[in-house]
Curated annotation (Swiss-Prot):
Quaternary structure and interacting proteins, as annotated: Monomer.
Protein name (database record): Elongation factor Tu
Region (G5): 174-176
Region (G3): 81-84
EC number(s) on file: 3.6.5.3
Record's keyword annotation contains Metal-binding: yes
Principal subcellular localisation of the protein: cytoplasm
Region (G2): 60-64
Class of enzymatic activity (EC top level): hydrolase
Organism: Chlamydia pneumoniae
Keywords: Cytoplasm, Elongation factor, GTP-binding, Hydrolase, Magnesium, Metal-binding, Nucleotide-binding, Protein biosynthesis
Reaction(s) catalysed (UniProt annotation): GTP + H2O = GDP + phosphate + H(+)
Length: 394
């Protein structure tokens, strides 16, 4: 049986749920599919089918970003249910780097929690341009405590504005009640999706640039070969195009023999779309997450660069102490993280939390790098800085 062909008749948007652990991100994702399935715009996905990798089930906590698709009357959405647990912020970075906007889920009973703040900060660092807030679990607050919800809203608006997200719409509701079929709360989820439609603009995709896709995952399909998945950052890829695999080792050439999106075949993949590419003659061990697949010779692997970096303050979740030349944190680019050695500018003895500084970095492995590219710097499970590559040295 041949696969269905993907229909491209609406603008395609990538969004995701972010926020503190147990505030209801995955429940909301399921509730959105439930609310839209009533209009024939989504297939209902229950909580357990979204929260679906083995290590997640055991802890009841989402680890890998899970992709769900649905439509509103105006758009087609690919929705990433992003990790909420502190150990897995790494995946949040790679999941968030692909969002055109995010739904920040906050429990009305708790208000903003440490991870709420970290996720807003990370969203800003990795370039998520717009946020819509879903204030969840309002059904658990009694009438006499209703003004608490107003306080939580005010606090959230201030927090978002501080990080550069001004005037974010806030929708109140209960994901669980919507999931259980309560008509009033299903209406709230529709209201949320209307706010997403209205407040997260369709981005201009970089269709005309040379094709590039950071690889998120690699699968082996028996009898067909190796599939790499990810979100196309720019350009167009067609079946039978020659491409290169760049980064984390020697550059390899291959040919694209298939393009798929949500298990449907496509003649081509375009900038902004999450796709799987079937590659000819590439074994599962020849390719890994963190490489990019791109138009031949459009990007080169590098290890050394100059960068403009902002080092987070202690209050923003950053380091408490300065660092010196020879510091070795992890650098996160697109879907990869690599240890790098930092050299401070001449005459600078140390870098304090809160500083803006120019750093020379040498990575211990090659990565497909370009000038102007953004990255996060992490150490011991927390983000300590964010930067942009100003010049490639080698």
């Amino acid at each position: 049986m041949s696969k269905e062909t993907f229909q491209r008749n609406k603008p395609h948007i990538n969004i995701g749920t972010i926020g503190h652990v147990d505030h209801g991100k995955t429940t909301l994702t399921a509730a959105i599919t439930r609310a839209l399935s009533g209009d024939g715009l989504a297939s209902f996905r229950d909580y357990s089918s979204i929260d679906n990798t083995p290590e997640e089930k055991a802890r009841g906590i989402t680890i890998n970003a899970s992709h769900v698709e649905y439509e509103t009357p105006n758009r087609h959405y690919a929705h990433v249910d992003c990790p909420g647990h502190a150990d897995y912020v790494k995946n949040m970075i790679t999941g968030a780097a692909q969002m055109d906007g995010a739904i920040l889920v906050v429990s009305a009973t708790d208000g903003a929690m440490p991870q709420t703040k970290e996720h807003i900060l990370l969203a800003r660092q990795v370039g998520v341009p717009y946020i819509v807030v879903f204030l969840n679990k309002v059904d658990m607050i009694s009438q006499e405590d209703a003004e608490l919800i107003d306080l939580v809203e005010m606090e959230l608006s201030e927090l978002l504005e501080e990080k550069g997200y001004k005037g974010c719409p806030i929708i109140r509701g209960s994901a669980l009640k919507a999931l259980e079929g309560d008509a009033n709360y299903i209406e709230k989820v529709r209201e949320l999706m209307q706010a997403v439609d209205d407040n997260i603009p369709t981005p201009e995709r970089e269709i005309d640039k040379p094709f590039l896709m950071p690889i998120e995952d690699v699968f082996s399909i028996s009898g067909r070969g190796t599939v790499v998945t990810g979100r196309i950052e720019r350009g167009i890829v067609k079946v039978s195009d020659k491409v290169q695999l760049v980064g984390l080792g020697e550059t390899k050439e291959t040919i694209v023999t298939g393009v798929e999106m949500f298990r449907k075949e496509l003649p081509e993949g375009r900038a902004g779309e999450n796709v799987g590419l079937l590659l000819r003659g590439i074994g599962k061990n020849d390719v890994e997450r963190g490489m990019v697949v791109c138009q031949p010779n459009s990007v080169k692997p590098h290890t050394k660069f100059k960068s403009a970096v902002y080092v987070l303050q202690k209050e923003e979740g950053g380091r408490h102490k300065p660092f010196f030349s020879g510091y070795r944190p992890q650098f996160f680019f697109r879907t990869t993280d690599v240890t790098g050695v930092v050299t401070l500018p001449e005459g600078t003895e140390m870098v304090m939390p809160g500083d803006n500084v120019e750093l020379d970095v040498e990575l211990i492995g090659t990565v497909a790098l370009e000038e102007g590219m953004r990255f996060a710097i992490r150490e011991g499970g927390r983000t300590i800085g964010a930067g942009t590559i100003s010049k490639i040295n080698a």
